[in-house]
Amino acid sequence: MMKRGFWFVVGLVVTIILLPSLVLSNSIGEQGIYADRLRAEPYNLLGRKIAIGQVEIGRPAQFGYDKVAAWQPPYKLAGVFFRDQIAKPNTYLDNHAAMVATVMVSDDKKIPGVAPKARLYSGAVGSLRRGGQPEECLASQNIARQNSGDVRAINFSFGESLQRDQRQEAKLDGQALLTQCVDWSSRVDDVLYVIAGNQGKGGIPIPTDHFNGITTAYTAKREGKFTKVDFANISALPVGIGRSLIKREINDGSRRSINLVAPGNKIELYDLKGKLNTVSGTSFAAPHITASVALLQEYGDQQINQKNPHWSLDSRRHQVMKAVMLNAADKIKDTGDGLLLGMRRTVLTKDQKTWLESDAYKDPKIPLDMQMGTGHLNTFRAYQQFSNGQWSATESIAAIGWDYGTVTANDYQDYALEKPLKANSFVSITLAWDRLVELIDTNRNNLYDIDESFRDRGLNNLDVYLLPAQEDNNTKYTCASLSDSDSLEHIFCPIPTSGKYKIRVQYRQQVNEKEQAFALAWWTVTE
């Protein structure tokens, strides 16, 4: 935690260790997320013309606008705000927000950001003594509506406590106002929210129980590479001494919180005064994901502008970004034969377990590992997943690809793979769709206003199967993901025999609308 003047920063989802900098971090390179490959030739992706957002208690400084110091921050901001207004100079400045911004858009040679040319809009909520979830929702909505309403991802490196929630016996059930706000905004503004996971002694878990974005835990280095879920993450089953805390501060029911992990231990970043500090926390894992969206979206927009085949405006959908990044995550290091999809690292939980030892690998009703979700962010692999383009259910599909489609209640969409799959190779499939949250818009201005609320219309139940090409009986699947509580399904399994296969998206149970939009990403190895 940090204080700056009168600043009362109880909302930050972070454990920060301020140490002298000894070794510069390489979290965006091959020790971390492999984004440096995309920044270099021939890709040359820097996030140009892509807008991303940041919502925090405070905000970073804007050089030439805020006269806090002679030092020029290593980033440029597209806009700075206090809630839904332009921020006044020298107000709501915060070291934590500055360091999070550095991860995303720093143009410094020593401490480069993931997407230095992205347009970052930063919004401050202000002192929590004078605000709470309504003000946080207002600030989020304001950031989502910047850049003419075209903001591709928003970073949340802060959170709210259950103790401050106005509900009686509040729990992480997706019903907090801020959580509903995030899921509503993700749908109506079509923006991917990336939420820093709960950690340390807890106390700041809202909105980690959202459905429509990505929640992250953070990793530490082992043998020079970010591979291990750090102990400070609250992302384990509720057992042992901390059982009562952990049980209260993870999702209610069977739905798991963590979707993806990213580097967050001992990251070197600049504060407001230009001092280099070593920091740790989920707060610094989340912006690795948020800024990676900017790199992918720059590439996607290039393909759209060039009118390349297998590209459409669907590439901008938040569900597509979620499915692509989760599906391309590292789990188990490939030995070089490609059977493990070219993965670059073996990721370990706190207790030294791999994804192949998880209940998510063994049980089709559990799509996510409790601690690592689908695995570790690999931005270059996400590019490989994304760059193969969109393939619809009306055509034979490539070995790697994605789609944005719809399915009707009690029906299914089949995606037939064009080429036979290789025996003993692994397949990765991710299906993502939204919970339906609606604004109770009392003044009918199509905006959230303080004192307004939301209506949760629930989550339709979709499943995903990998079936032999000629098989129509779902019970005879090769692999499946069949959760009844999640807004995503994920398959990672070996192919038993060579042959032709298809992916089936099944609309199992209708809760709200008859037609459900979804994003699907797949990665296979063909003969």
Predicted regions and their residues:
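Active-site neighborhood of phospho(di)ester-bond hydrolases with catalytic His/Asp-centered motifs
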Residues: 155-157, 193-198, 216
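Gly/Ser-rich catalytic serine loop of serine hydrolases
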Residues: 89-101, 174, 275-291
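Extracellular S/T/G-rich loop segment that most often corresponds to the catalytic His/Ser-adjacent loop
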Residues: 206-298
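Subtilisin-like serine protease catalytic core
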Residues: 26-28, 37-135, 148-153, 163-165, ...
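C-terminal edge strands of extracellular/lumenal beta-sandwich accessory domains
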Residues: 317-318, 322, 327, 413-417, ...
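Secreted peptidase-domain scaffold signal
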Residues: 342-460, 520-527
